[in-house]
């Protein structure tokens, strides 16, 4: 590649990276711009192996710009493309509405607040996708705060912290701050003391059932009028671990006759005998409830906008009492409905998935049958495809259904151009098992294209001298013909395929089936799918690929290569991506 060509590639890559970043309001990806770059400049294609290294610094530079800088630079390089994009934007109904009162804040600062009791299922990705997209739209800040202050009921999983950060990275975002609530217990104690001094909290030793009866009747418990000094003393005893679980709580003094019983004198702190799994927090026994901890952190960490489930409307109302005591402004709130995901037999529940893994019914969090972010990544689905599908759900208060087909469609657009084609013949009862036949006459090898839309990439050479295997369901009756894709027309005679040399146009007119095949001595491969594992035989060229490469098994679908065997005695493994 000479310097002149390198400069042309660099300039074209910058235009495409800017266009991609501005259009999607996100960072550009090398893979996402390769297709348009090659499509608009066919002369670049012979340098396909070198181009990613040339354009990577360009993409990195574009990603270092803010939204306004990208638009200005695109206007310099390709004003007509920016005009087309703006015309599209004017006619587009953005699924994400503008944030309320965003213009009143110097910096829009939003958070995801996961409970790290396990890696994320697919539904969890929605919050990160939307918060990350708003961050990009407003050039704001993204906080990941682990709300890990329940060491017993929703006990944190130590592996989940990194797993969740990996999931956010997979989706294409990087938090500006990562905070563990369990590192901030002393801060919660400090504000509890201030609240007590303001008359906003009292210690209570009522049995839970007894207090519930009083609360539901709008009656105060005997401890409600306790003075601040006594409350402070008993709270310090809580902090020192002098009470057992259930023996003493600290309540926020609200309105005991409030029309909504859920808002009446709710618990701010309780005693927990189970130590926290994090060594840095294992000494604490007095733990804040989520509404107190989360509300406090939203203010102290400068959160301007909160997105939460419609079922958590009472949380904002409870937290408002605390905010009123401290004379704080409550953040802007968007409530949305729950998301349900189709296609999976496994519940969209962290605890349910964990139980299935523990029972051995799932191999792990990245099992293709699990509705998890880790599973999507291992299957070869790009995070951008997930984000785009989540964004299309909007922020309605109604419950929404996520069709996996929308993720698949997005991902197909991202990977199709770059995915070479390959043959894989499934040895399963569902497809009639494997059938082996010798080829009589004809060429020694088939030569299907690596990609039907990009002939310049070349062809795959698949030998037939050892015979071929096809799926039993594709085997024609004796005397009938089939077209072995990339090889030619054969007639099924006795126990062989006799090469006929018929022209493809004649075959099409007569309705002859076109099928995939593999050499009888091709490498063994196991395809892991949502319906279970399928073994079979692949074409030998598969050994030339690397782990993480995505190919399209013709007539089956896309698959990510998870393990590429380099000898005939070892089975390769691939994960089915989608049709």
Curated annotation (Swiss-Prot):
Reactions listed under catalytic activity: tRNA(Glu) + L-glutamate + ATP = L-glutamyl-tRNA(Glu) + AMP + diphosphate
GO biological process assignments: amide biosynthetic process; glutamyl-tRNA aminoacylation
Gene3D superfamilies cross-referenced by the UniProt entry: 2.40.240.100, HUPs, Ribosomal Protein L25, Chain P
Cellular component, GO, one term: cytosol
UniProt short sequence motif 'HIGH' region, positions renumbered to this chain: 114-124
Places the protein is found: Cytoplasm
Known EC number: 6.1.1.17
Presence of keyword Ribonucleoprotein: no
One Pfam family, short name: tRNA-synt_1c_C
GO molecular function: ATP binding; glutamate-tRNA ligase activity; zinc ion binding
Superkingdom in the source lineage: Archaea
Alphabetized UniProt keyword annotations: Aminoacyl-tRNA synthetase, ATP-binding, Cytoplasm, Ligase, Nucleotide-binding, Protein biosynthesis
Family statement drawn from the similarity comment of this UniProt entry: Belongs to the class-I aminoacyl-tRNA synthetase family. Glutamate--tRNA ligase type 2 subfamily.
Role according to the record: Catalyzes the attachment of glutamate to tRNA(Glu) in a two-step reaction: glutamate is first activated by ATP to form Glu-AMP and then transferred to the acceptor end of tRNA(Glu).
PANTHER family: GLUTAMATE--TRNA LIGASE, GLUTAMINE-TRNA LIGASE
Record's protein name: Glutamate--tRNA ligase
Species in which this protein is naturally found: Haloarcula marismortui (strain ATCC 43049 / DSM 3752 / JCM 8966 / VKM B-1809) (Halobacterium marismortui)
Biological classification of the source: Archaea, Methanobacteriati, Methanobacteriota, Stenosarchaea group, Halobacteria
